[in-house]
Amino acid sequence: MDKRWSLQGMTALVTGAASGIGYAIVEELASFGAIIHICDISETLLSQSLSEWEKKGFQVSGSICDVASRPDREKLMQTVSSLFDGKLNILVNNVGVIRGKPTTEYVAEDFSYHISTNLEPAFHFSQLSHLLLKASGFGSIVFMSSATGVVSVQCGSIYSLTKGALNQLTRNLACEWAKDGIRANAVAPNVVKTPLSQSYLEDVGFKEALFSRTPLGRAGEPNEVASLVVFLCLPAASYITGQTICIDGGFTVNAFSYKPQA
């Protein structure tokens, strides 16, 4: 295989990876030959996922981690450093949460909940992994952003601002750490079929509104997002950095639909 299209022997950390998009990212990374460590807050899901990957012959290990806990994050990175001999090729800041409400209904706890899960861990994990990524000689960070961090949507302003902040962090790190051989990019999906989005997609009004604004007329699949994430980590993508790439069925470029009368 052309080495540009291989991750053979490269190491990766994926956060929140025992289900949903994170799970799909691990499967894709492993299929390209990466050696992966994941974290998740659910011991049950983690054990189940690790067992499934072992049966497939994937090289995946895992740790229980509450990413909202600074000590947990530091402990996780110590584990990763030990496992991978002080080097890391890929960091995927995937974990995220959402509480969809009108802005006037949010309370202080909602704000801290989103910041402490969606934004602070991604920033801190990037800090903690800097020396490991630099030591690898070929480092790549991918942030899981959202289409809502690119365009405005109703009932999710705090979630959206955390994703918009990740897009800016992507640009900052891409420029600041390029000299260290580290690239940084963000992936911004539309709604994707995962446990996190299930309740939204079961809402007929939400689903109709979303699909009418999405040219491809459907939600995304986890493996579709995973394909883009893994591409950005490949040597083939070595000149791509600082970008927020929407994977959204056309949602963010769609203005309005109008059919003139015949």
Swiss-Prot record:
Active site at Y159
Top enzyme class of this protein? oxidoreductase
- The source's superkingdom equals Eukaryota
Q: Where does substrate bind?
A: S146
What InterPro entries does the database record attribute to this sequence?
Answer: NAD(P)-bd_dom_sf, SDR_fam, TR
The GO molecular function terms of this record are: oxidoreductase activity
Q: Which GO terms describe its cellular component?
A: peroxisome
Keywords of the record, alphabetical order, are:
NADP, Oxidoreductase
Keyword Chloroplast appears in the UniProt entry: no
Q: What EC number(s) does the entry state?
A: 1.1.1.-
* Residues binding NADP(+), per UniProt: 13-37
Q: Which SUPFAM superfamilies match?
A: NAD(P)-binding Rossmann-fold domains
Family of this protein: Belongs to the short-chain dehydrogenases/reductases (SDR) family. SDR65C subfamily.
Protein name per the record: Tropinone reductase homolog At2g29310
Please give the organism. Answer: Arabidopsis thaliana
